Amino acid sequence: MLQSSNSFARLLAELQKLPGVGEKTALRLAFHLLKYPENTAALAESLGEVLSRVKFCSVCFGITEEDPCRLCSSDRDETSLCVVEEPQDLLAVERTRAFRGRYHVLQGALSPLNGVTPDRLRIAELMRRLEEGTVREVVIATNFSVEGETTALYLARQIKPLGIRVTRLAHGIPLGSDLEYVDAATVQRALEGRSEL
């Protein structure tokens, strides 16, 4: 029956590549996709559209359909730069409406044990932006995990010699949590209570 279906097995394998999707969830999703083909067709069309239209901004490395993105093209405060790990973290900070500066997305966090070194992140691009001389404060908003803390300390060591103020979000956000899952009020309090590194 299904064990001999190469296409079904491939679908299961591809679904399991998504974060948080194990074997059981992949199976449940696959059966749902088969049961509702009209929804599946709309999902496939939406995925195709995203893959062809959405890209990373060449300035901040957030996601956008136009380059540079809306945030980089706006008249936001150019003297303050918030550095986050992932595009979804940018959205979490932006949801608070407490930060009026610009952003820089690293596209990850340092994790030497997993092979994520500074050259694998958008740190060189960050340093180039800072060397332009417009930014006076960098708000480091990496996650409060071992990797996020390591990244924050590494960035602070790289940025401080440039004479730029380096601050870190306050620890009102629980250790080990990801910004995308924290409510806007908590992120806002953390932004307001940020401290020097």
UniProtKB/Swiss-Prot annotation:
Q: Which GO terms describe its molecular function?
A: DNA binding; zinc ion binding
UniProt name for this protein: Recombination protein RecR
Tell me any Pfam family this protein matches.
RecR_C
Question: SUPFAM superfamilies attached here?
Answer: Recombination protein RecR
Q: Which UniProt keywords apply?
A: DNA damage, DNA recombination, DNA repair, Metal-binding, Zinc, Zinc-finger
Q: Which SMART domains does its entry note?
A: HhH1 (SM00278), TOPRIM (SM00493)
Supply the source organism's classification.
Answer: Bacteria, Pseudomonadati, Thermodesulfobacteriota, Desulfuromonadia, Geobacterales
Q: Does the keyword Metal-binding apply?
A: yes
- Kindly list the ranges of residues that form C4-type zinc fingers according to the record: 57-72
Q: What does this protein do?
A: May play a role in DNA repair. It seems to be involved in an RecBC-independent recombinational process of DNA repair. It may act with RecF and RecO.
Please list the residue ranges annotated as the Toprim domain: 79-174
